[in-house]
Amino acid sequence: FFAGGTYTFGNVREPTAYITPERASERSWRVNYGYQADGNIVSEIDQGDFRRSSVADTNIGGVSFAKLLSDGERVDFNGKLAIFRHFEEDEGNGNFFSYAAYITATGRGFSPWTDQEVFRYSFGFGMSYADKVPITEQRKQAAKGNNTSRFLNYLELQLDFPLRRVFRKTSVLKNCYAGVTVVHRSGIFGTSDILGDVAGGSDWITAHLECKAGS
């Protein structure tokens, strides 16, 4: 059993503001849909390997909700909750849900000529729980004689572009972004007892639409 704590240095009478007032109520929602990937999020998918899985032909759809936790000149931090529907009936594993709670760090790229936002990129880290173990994880782990777990580490990579650069600023899509999200579940190389000592996981490549509200 372990216990811990944190302490943030600051002025009690003048608390540090982590969000600028004009963005204090900022929230967002996202929908995404995609396919089971063959490669791993690190060193394969992030290097351009977008092949479909050779282990199982499945799809995933999801919706997520985010709250801005901290904004900055270069990076914003958001807290996110996501619900995914796994479509694995054709592979004999049925259809089921998984859930993720995580934090994302989001950066932005700007045009050198106009200082307008051109794209966003983000990395998310948290935990995932699935109602069933995805079929790809079952098959990969069985081939190695390893454990499976419904509760695993969650990683996410996202790259998208502001739709206001395509549509008029008066459009309902002016606060929306379209792009690609990579969804990943894994056991952190079999180094975690709480995750069942699972080594390996599963990845999905999805297209998404994300829109801000309240800013």
Locations of the language-model features?
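Short glycine/proline- and aromatic-enriched beta-strand/turn motifs that initiate or cap beta-hairpins
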Residues: 1-67, 210
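Residues that define the transmembrane beta-barrel architecture of outer-membrane proteins
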Residues: 1, 25, 55-61, 93-101, ...
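Gram-negative (and chloroplast) outer-membrane scaffold detector with strong preference
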Residues: 59-131
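Transmembrane beta-strands of outer-membrane beta-barrel pores
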Residues: 7-9, 33-39, 67, 81-89, ...
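Transmembrane beta-strands of outer-membrane beta-barrel proteins
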Residues: 3, 27-31, 75-81, 99-101, ...
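Short loop/turn motifs that connect adjacent beta-strands in outer-membrane beta-barrel proteins
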Residues: 12-27, 68-77, 109-120, 164-178, ...
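Extracellular loop and loop/strand-boundary signature of outer-membrane beta-barrel proteins
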Residues: 46-52, 86-93, 141-146, 192-196
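Predominantly the C-terminal beta-signal and adjacent terminal strand-loop region
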Residues: 1-4, 8-17, 154-215
